Amino acid sequence: DFNALTKRYTQAYLEGPQIFKHGTSGVVPVANMLNTFVYKNRTEGQSPDVQTLDGARIVENFDMRGGGMHNCMTGCIVKCSNIVHDADGNYKTSALEFETITLLGANCAIKTIDEVANLDRLCDELGLDTIETGAALGVLMDSGGMEWGDSAAAARVLEEITRGGETGCMIGHGVVETGKRRG
């Protein structure tokens, strides 16, 4: 019977090692060790900022800031999705996952989880995919259009999308368009 099998599986999972208890953001150190935590538009496989981009920083802040782990959808037993609050305890974003930390963070030489969370929130508000946007910002930085690691400038470019600015529209159209325009 399916329900009995599901119950047994759920129980075995919950009693076993919880390798994803911190979500996919918890694999940042492993990816860095394996040279797959892309840095500076994929020109390097390791980030010197791995400690400040590690998803463990998110979990460490739960007690002080609020937030927490939750299930990404009804019925999910893993509960590896996170809710991130800012330093004042206000909701900032949710589901700050490995891919977002990698592309909006290390790929752009952005140094901290808080900076990535700010960019993630802007992407959410603008309806932008964080992976595509991080890749486009990386191309912009790599081509000299913005300083590496300048999260404030990256935020300004994302905000420019709503005003129809040239650079903002280019980033909003994605990495292929950004690559074509930036050569």
Language model segments and positions:
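Intrinsically disordered, low-complexity segments enriched in small residues
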Residues: 1-183
